[in-house]
Amino acid sequence: MAEKHFFLGVEAIWASPRMCDLFAQVRRIAQSALPVVLLGESGSGREVIARALHYYSPRRPKPFVDLSCGSLPANLIEAELFGYDRRSLTAPHSTRSGLLELAHEGTLFLNEIGSLAPRAEARLLQTFDASHSLGFVRQSHSNVRIIAATSSPSSAQRLYSALSARKTVELLEIPPLRERPEDIEALACHFLSQQNPELRFASGAMTALYAYLWPGNVRELRNTVLRSALLSKGPLLHADDILFSPAVPGACAGVAGLEPALIRQALADSGGRLQRAADSLGISRHALSRKIRFYGLNTTTLIERISA
């Protein structure tokens, strides 16, 4: 059964046990004021998780301010975060409040922090110690909860270690869509109803959606469904009607071709035990059974070979 929630104007839908567990962690962590590091691929829902953390927290009535660090030159990071005063600059700029001040008593979400240069990242880390207005000797401390997100495991670990040296910090990992296939149908049907409530998926179309690896995650699924619905000519979307991203399928197909072999290996390693094999692959038993049927894998023959 899919769950649907709204967090600060952003809709979130999930049906998989992994996302249920993740949002249970979100509700628990939201009650504290601890900084949070989010690790998740592009399009996996990092902003949704950040907004949910703010929504469930006591800071909910206060501002939620977000900044995409990857779109900002390193030399502007400090001015954006701390603000500036014209007395500290040679150019005739007026005084401007920084994002830390704007987010006072609320939440500051720093997305794509892994794309920052080391020097800029070091400046950001200073915000966890003290915040000040650029050009002022006097320091003014801000009461802000900071959530930092990245798609790079190494960046997440580096940031987590750096923050842990200063204070307790939480780390949340957002699973990619390919590791929670139970969410594909719920999300796809939702996106389709948004675009055209009269359209439905044929069984073959849903099979095609399940077989795709979704390197762009939920964002790519949404764009694929909307694009396919716009060009649909009938009441049903069939497998041939699904318009996958033209930039990705070749690479994706190469990875997808490895999946049957990975499943066979997991079954062999687990002695044919589906639950153990599913756990090793990071998916549910239901998802594994569906993939076995899709690829036409003969598990009986495989188990007999293992036992021989």
Label every PLM stretch briefly.
Residues 87-94, 126-134:
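Short gly/ser/thr-rich secondary-structure transition/capping motifs
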Residues 36-37, 48, 52, 74-79, ...:
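Conserved AAA+/SF3 P-loop NTPase catalytic/coupling segment centered on the Walker-B
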